[in-house]
């Protein structure tokens, strides 16, 4: 600097020695301070000293303008441009190797040669240790009270020989950072400045021209000679003097190639993770099931997966090893791109967890069969690639853990699985009940399903098989009935209803006779017998009914067998199907809850057919009365329930004159009394043959055939429509009308044998031809109004003794009226009274003229005792 005596006389030096006076003054100030304020002065000296010098020079007026001979003062460095590899961190510059960095130099008289006064060293500035300081005393002085020389100037940082000036107070220099040595991750360098401008003029090329602290060109007292040519370099006394050079960030691969590899590895990671869950979740048992009963696509998938899945441990080791290798490589590549900080952790976690774990496992958990089958070639490839490592480990696992069997369900688990999956499977409720019942068969005993003894229908062994007993058996609806003697628990025999097929109730056969003849074996079982064992016994065909007993050892005395109830095959089947089997004879829906069955129809009451001797003149059995009643109600439309109630029909059949007998006379086969119907003779009654044979002659051709029991005739006599029979109509019938009326297309239905429905008339023309001569001679007796007359065109003659039903039109009409009254809602007393009055009119009513005419022509006289045909007059 130029001389400045007013401010600092000791600092006046020539040429390059002015810069060296600054540290000397600072060191003198340090020695004059107390130990307590030493640190503060030390921190402020380096920054405030240049400013004090400048203010001193300007204030005293002794400082000259800056010129070419003015010394350069360097205050500090700052990083000009910051980026990913060059930045400020904690007051130090952090740069990367193999880079060029621009630094801004701050100071006074910055010129084009300032770059040559800056250097860096690898050695850190020496600091006093606590042991070198006195406890409570002042710090030991610096060596010879001079500045510290820099160590060897490093060659790793090269100062490029140019500077960009800015107002002589700052400039921009550029440095080049060379590569670090091997095994070095980072390295610290420290700023040094020279006391003179190197290689500049006579006074600056070799050494300092003045002395500092009484020493000559040897440099700072107490230090070895300067190592760099003849220039003295000292540590820069400031805070921003440290530069940290870090390792250059290198990518393992080019960036674009790394992105491709990362994407591929993410896909492989997801595949391994998904296959690990999807394939290992498919146990061998499930794959076999799918192979046998899945869809065609599922069968194909299972067939491709099953050989690989059979080697479970080998597959598991291959998938896990591949997954670990892929994830490790992926982590390294992501770390190389994102770095090793928090960003790298977040990126790696998101990439692996979301795209490598969550997404593929969510897909494979639902579509593992399809994904595993479509990627089976990749699975086999990686199993081959990892064979050296995964196969030995898998064999070790096989030896330690044993063979993999798969998921096996016992009865309880299978039943619970069906219940839990009920909303999602296609089983209907009945199918599910049957499956549950079959699975629970071995867990239940016969005592759980048996019918208790008190609720069983049983018959005493002393019973007589008359109509009352057999009716009771039929009404019970059971096919196998236990027979007891004395107490109900003493079951000695078994009666099958089919055993009564050849039993006549009129014979009053003792029950013991039937049971001893058939001698059905009794089957006893204990109350703890399982239902599956009971079903096997029933399947052997020994019996479909078993008697349940238990050993009673309660109380005093010897143990004995106690009968609890009976169990049937139907009970076991009902337990399997979880539903009650009801037929038309069941009384209860369940033999335990005793819930009544709601029958849609009235139950048949066989007691109505139990007749007394005084009710009928002709003795018939209750069975025949029942058969006759059912035949008329079902086969003859005129007596169907829609026309006449069954109760009224039964009362009609029980009237004394409805059922009649006719004794056949062998000597006089064609006597008038042997004819039930004669051709062209009007009648008003219906006939049903019960026993015997008749000969029917029908048509103009006189065709003859025989008929027997349950053939009937004269239905139209009961329901014949009114026919106009006026005298004028009778005598004006022409031959043409007769022929026209007798055309083959009109209602011709000759009588049929074998109990089939017989026609009432062959043709309307035949009836007209027959009516003309008969009614023409009786025109004085008949009115010109309508007459309900039925004229058969056939003859019915007895061929043997007959027993038949004969119902007149009047009786039928009264019965119809009684049926209508029976259906009309009214009090029961008035109803029964009116019905009885109506039925009484069947024989109390006065016959009209037509009835008298019919009676005269068809009444049969009693020629022999006990061989007569009852008069067909109104009942």
Curated annotation (Swiss-Prot):
GO MF, one example: magnesium ion transmembrane transporter activity
Extracellular-side segments: 1-250, 360-368
Domain CBS: 450-511, 518-584
Effect of residue 112 to A: Loss of N-glycosylation; 90% decrease of plasma membrane expression
Disulfide cysteine pairs (residue numbers): none
Family matches, as SUPFAM superfamilies: CBS-domain pair
Transmembrane regions listed in the UniProt entry: 251-271, 339-359, 369-389
UniProt region (Disordered), positions on chain: 121-149, 741-763
Tissue: Widely expressed, with highest levels in kidney, lung, spleen and testis. In the kidney, predominantly expressed in the distal convoluted tubule and, at lower levels, in the connecting tubule (at protein level).
Subunit note: Isoform 1 and isoform 2 may interact with each other.
Protein name: Metal transporter CNNM2
């Amino acid at each position: 600097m130029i001389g400045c005596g007013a401010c600092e006389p000791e600092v006046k030096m020539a040429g390059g020695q002015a810069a060296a006076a600054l540290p000397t003054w600072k060191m003198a100030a340090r020695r004059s301070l107390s130990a307590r304020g030493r640190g503060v002065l030390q921190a402020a000296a380096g920054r405030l000293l240049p400013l004090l010098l400048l203010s001193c020079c300007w204030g005293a007026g002794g400082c000259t303008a800056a010129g070419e001979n003015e010394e350069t003062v360097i205050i500090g460095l700052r990083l000009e441009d910051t980026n990913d590899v060059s930045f400020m961190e904690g007051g130090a510059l952090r740069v990367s190797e193999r880079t060029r960095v621009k630094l801004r130099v701050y100071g006074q008289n910055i010129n084009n040669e300032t770059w040559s006064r800056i250097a860096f060293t690898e050695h850190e500035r020496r600091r006093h240790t606590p042991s070198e300081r006195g406890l409570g005393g002042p710090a030991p002085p610096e060596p010879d009270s001079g500045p510290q020389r820099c160590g060897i100037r490093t060659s790793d940082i090269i100062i490029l020989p140019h500077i960009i000036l800015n107002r002589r107070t700052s400039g921009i220099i550029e440095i080049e950072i060379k590569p670090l040595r091997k095994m070095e991750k980072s390295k610290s360098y420290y700023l040094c400045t020279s006391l003179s401008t190197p290689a500049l003029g006579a006074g600056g090329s070799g050494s300092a021209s003045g002395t500092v602290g009484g020493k000559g060109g040897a440099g700072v007292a107490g230090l070895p000679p300067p190592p760099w040519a003849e220039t003295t370099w000292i540590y820069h006394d400031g805070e921003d003097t440290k530069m940290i050079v870090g390792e250059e960030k290198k990518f393992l691969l080019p960036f674009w190639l790394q992105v491709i590899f990362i994407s591929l590895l993410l896909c492989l990671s997801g595949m391994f993770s998904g296959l690990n869950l999807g394939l290992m979740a498919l146990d061998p048992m499930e794959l076999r099931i799918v192979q046998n009963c899945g869809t065609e696509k599922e069968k194909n998938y299972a067939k491709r997966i099953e050989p690989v899945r059979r080697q479970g441990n080998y597959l598991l080791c291959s998938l896990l090893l591949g997954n670990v290798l892929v994830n490790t490589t992926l982590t390294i590549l992501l770390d190389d791109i994102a770095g090793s900080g928090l960003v790298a952790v977040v990126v790696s976690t998101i990439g692996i967890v979301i795209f490598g774990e969550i997404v593929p496992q969510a897909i494979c958990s639902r579509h593992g069969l399809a994904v595993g089958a479509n990627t089976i070639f990749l699975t086999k490839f990686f199993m081959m690639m990892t064979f050296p490592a995964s196969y030995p480990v898998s064999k070790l696992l096989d030896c330690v853990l044993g063979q993999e069997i798969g998921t096996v369900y016992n009865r309880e688990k299978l039943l619970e699985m069906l219940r839990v999956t009920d909303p999602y499977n296609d089983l209907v409720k009945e199918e599910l009940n049957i499956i549950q019942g079959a699975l629970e068969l071995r867990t239940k005993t016969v005592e759980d399903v048996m019918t208790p003894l008190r609720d069983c229908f049983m018959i005493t062994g002393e019973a007589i098989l008359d109509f009352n007993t057999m009716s009771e058996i039929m009404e019970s609806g059971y096919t196998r009935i236990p027979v007891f003697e004395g107490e109900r628990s003493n079951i000695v025999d078994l009666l099958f209803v089919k055993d009564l097929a050849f039993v006549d109730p009129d014979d009053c056969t003792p029950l013991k006779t039937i049971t001893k003849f058939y001698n059905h074996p009794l089957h006893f079982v204990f109350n703890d017998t399982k239902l599956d064992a009971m079903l096997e016994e029933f399947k052997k065909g020994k019996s479909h009914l078993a008697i349940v007993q238990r050993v009673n050892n309660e109380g005093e005395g010897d143990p004995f067998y106690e009968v609890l109830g009976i169990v049937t095959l139907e009970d076991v089947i009902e337990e399997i199907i979880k539903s009650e089997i009801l037929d038309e004879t069941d009384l209860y829906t369940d033999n335990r809850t005793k819930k009544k069955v709601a029958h849609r129809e009235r139950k048949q009451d066989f007691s109505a057919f139990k007749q007394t001797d005084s009710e009928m003149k002709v003795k018939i059995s209750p069975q025949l009365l029942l058969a006759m009643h059912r035949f008329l109600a079902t086969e003859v439309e005129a007596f169907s329930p829609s026309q006449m109630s069954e109760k009224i029909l039964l009362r009609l059949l029980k009237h004394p004159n409805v059922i009649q007998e006719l004794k056949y006379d062998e000597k006089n086969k064609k006597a008038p009394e042997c004819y039930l119907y004669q051709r062209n003779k009007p009648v008003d009654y219906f006939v049903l043959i019960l026993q015997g044979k008749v000969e029917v002659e029908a048509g103009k051709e006189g065709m003859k055939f025989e008929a027997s029991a349950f053939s009937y005739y004269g239905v139209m006599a009961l329901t014949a429509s009114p026919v106009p029979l006026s005298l004028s109509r009778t005598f004006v019938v022409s031959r043409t009308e007769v022929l026209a009326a007798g055309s083959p297309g009109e209602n011709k239905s000759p009588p049929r044998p074998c109990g089939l429905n017989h026609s009432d008339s062959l043709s309307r023309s035949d009836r007209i031809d027959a009516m003309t001569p008969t009614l023409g001679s009786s025109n004085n007796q008949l009115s010109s109004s309508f007459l309900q007359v039925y004229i058969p065109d056939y003859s019915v003659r007895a061929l043997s003794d007959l027993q038949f039903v004969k119902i007149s039109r009047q009786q039928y009409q009264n019965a119809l009226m009684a049926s209508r009254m029976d259906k009309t809602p009214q009090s029961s007393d008035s109803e029964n009274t009116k019905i009885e009055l109506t039925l009484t009119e069947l024989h109390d009513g006065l016959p009209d003229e037509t009835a008298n005419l019919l009676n005269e022509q068809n009444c049969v006289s009693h020629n022999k005792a006990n061989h007569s045909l009852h008069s067909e007059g109104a009942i």
